[in-house]
Amino acid sequence: MRALPTLDSLARMRPPLGDPRAAEDTLTPRPANKSAVERLAADRAKYVRSTLGSSRGPVSEHRVPEAPGVQHRNPIPSALAPAPVARRAIARKPLRPDSLVIYRQKCEFVRGSDADCSRVGLMKKFFQGSGKDKMAVAPETTRVADEDKTTKETEATWTKSSQAAAARPASMLPPPTPVVAVKSPAEKTRVANEDKTTKETEATWTKSSQAAAARPASMLPPPTPVVAVKSPAEKTRVANEDKTTKETEATWTKSSQAAATRPASMLPPPTPVVAVKSPALPFEVAPRVPVGCSGVQLRVSRSKGLQRSQSDLSSRYSIAKAESDTFFKYCGLDPDVVEALGRENFSAGSDCVTLKVRSVSMAASDSSFSRHSEDGLQEEELLEQVPSTTSVVERNARIIKWLFTCKKAKETPSQKLQGPA
């Protein structure tokens, strides 16, 4: 597709009527009209500085030469002749190697065992860069090659020396060079002082052992006792434990001596300890037993190796038995009650004790107890009864039953109390 000529150009191209050569000019073939791109390329030399245009001359000079016998009156067709287009030279990058070259280089890299193949980068070897990149990489490659060469030479030297040492006998081998550790002056001084002190100590021990071996055993000094160094807190604790142990031993000794000197009848009755578990259970009457040492004191006495004699143990058991007998003799009553009733009234063969106990306890109770009750025994009938001897177990059982009845009557005042059966 080409541009159509304008009316002005057609009028100029039309030859005059009186010209005899107009028909010839009209019949001769004329060059095609230039397109807009061709006209722009022809006018480019006017406003673009190009090395190519300057070397070849202006673009307007490149015109199609006319025939010598043909003369054109109109200069426009010659100006419309196509002119060569000046193009700028573009620097292209080097092309990448084809796949075959890459494959060959990869095979050489894998097959080669030298350090050069392992040191050089695979990417730098495959893809060629510009001249500047090659110049920048060249010193590094040279340094790596030098290091590899030095390493190979060192390994070869060591291999030769080891083979030569293995080939010749041991008698021809040179003596090993001693390894001397370099020490600082302060370290040397400290080591010298330690060596000097060690030598002096050894000399002193040697002299003392020789002197001890030379003189007889009678002249030898007594051995120095080894004293364990204790802290102040440890000393205080041990002193307190010793003091407590001594006080406990003195107390036991005095009590055993006093119990051995006076008879069992003069021993004071123990105070019963009553522990109420629940309203449905009776009182638990327990005799007063001498309180023993605490756990710490027992451990201290055991650690000290304290041993009781046979007489001490027998006195302790006799005291416990005497107190138990006293408890059952006075029916577990308090000492003031026993004094009020009179100690002479408590005898093993008397049944009047039950009556006395009944009368005293009922006077102190808050219950509505009447002496003349229909369910229980009357006081006159008790006095008329003939005393009979009862066992200790039976008497204690009656007393415990009676105490339980008193407790229930105290809780429920409507219930009537009875004396011990």
UniProtKB/Swiss-Prot annotation:
Keyword Nucleus annotated: yes
Locations listed in the record: Cytoplasm, Cytoskeleton; Cytoplasm, Cytoskeleton, Microtubule organizing center, Centrosome; Cytoplasm, Cytoskeleton, Spindle pole; Nucleus
InterPro entries: FAM110 (IPR025740), FAM110_C (IPR025741)
Modified residues (Phosphoserine): S350
Protein keywords: Cytoplasm, Cytoskeleton, Microtubule, Nucleus, Phosphoprotein
UniProt keyword annotation of Cytoplasm present: yes
Listed GO CC annotations: cell cortex; centrosome; microtubule; nucleus; spindle pole
Region feature Disordered, mapped onto this chain: 1-36, 51-80, 141-266
A single GO molecular function term of this UniProt record: alpha-tubulin binding
One of the protein's GO biological processes: regulation of cell projection assembly
Biased composition (Basic and acidic residues): 143-155, 185-202, 232-249
PANTHER family noted in UniProt: AGAP005440-PA, PROTEIN FAM110C
Subunit note: Interacts with AKT1; the interaction is transient and follows AKT1 activation. Interacts with PPP2CA and alpha-tubulin.
Family, per entry: Belongs to the FAM110 family.
Role summary: May play a role in microtubule organization. May play a role in cell spreading and cell migration of epithelial cells; the function may involve the AKT1 signaling pathway.
Protein name (record): Protein FAM110C
